[in-house]
Amino acid sequence: MTMNNQIQHKDSTKVPEPTLRRLPWYLSNVKLLKQKGERYVSSTQISKEINIDASQIAKDLSYVNISGRTRVGYEVDALIAVLEDFLGFTNMHKAFLFGVGSLGGALLRDSGLSHFGLEIVAAFDVNPSLVGTTLNGIPIFHSDDFQKKMQEYGVHIGVLTVPIEIAQCITDTMVAGGIKAVWNFTPFRIRVPEDIVVQNTSLYAHLAVMFNRLNFNEIE
């Protein structure tokens, strides 16, 4: 069975969000197996590596419509290709970043984002010491230049790393300027029109979960 006839495209908008969160884990694990020279991988193998039930992995992979071989599993190259395509990692999505503080600066320095289909092409801030400079080759403009740069770059994704007190204001500006998706790193739950995609990634919320679990384990 060749890679071409193993892969069938499917609409990712119908996939449950927990599944979408797990698929990149499978992809990373399968890439590691490829580096070790593996040609085939089964759900059971992946399960042992990432501690997720094999039946759940098989169910998740059914959404991307790749067929495996009985007693052999999935062809590694085919599985990598279909997962990267399904998750949108094969297409480069340009983005603007708003707020070049410690977190924003770290994201600008993270060249690894491009391996997952995201390229931050410009950043915006109001700090005079930052405006007009570059970080990791990425230009930093004044926030007032956003609309002009939208026309120049044609970006549809905004990465939000501003202070919480201006998160909604900057979001409103982004949406009014044509941004269609917001990756929100602030702990503020921004409000957007229904047609705007928002992905909330609050580091502080994850810290709270970790601390709570740690305290619970210590009590036991």
From Swiss-Prot:
Subunit comment: Homodimer.
Gene Ontology molecular function: DNA binding; DNA-binding transcription factor activity
Alphabetic keyword roster: Cytoplasm, DNA-binding, NAD, Repressor, Transcription, Transcription regulation
Biological processes per GO annotation: negative regulation of DNA-templated transcription; response to redox state
GO annotation, cellular component aspect: cytoplasm
PANTHER family xref list: REDOX-SENSING TRANSCRIPTIONAL REPRESSOR REX, REDOX-SENSING TRANSCRIPTIONAL REPRESSOR REX 1
Residues in the DNA-binding region annotation: 25-64
Annotated source species: Bacteroides fragilis (strain ATCC 25285 / DSM 2151 / CCUG 4856 / JCM 11019 / LMG 10263 / NCTC 9343 / Onslow / VPI 2553 / EN-2)
Protein name (database record): Redox-sensing transcriptional repressor Rex
Keyword DNA-binding: yes
Keyword Chaperone: no
Annotated transmembrane regions: none
Binding-site residues, NAD(+): 99-104
Localization terms from the record: Cytoplasm
Similarity section: Belongs to the transcriptional regulatory Rex family.
Main location: cytoplasm
Origin: domain of life: Bacteria
Pfam family, one: CoA_binding
Role of this protein: Modulates transcription in response to changes in cellular NADH/NAD(+) redox state.
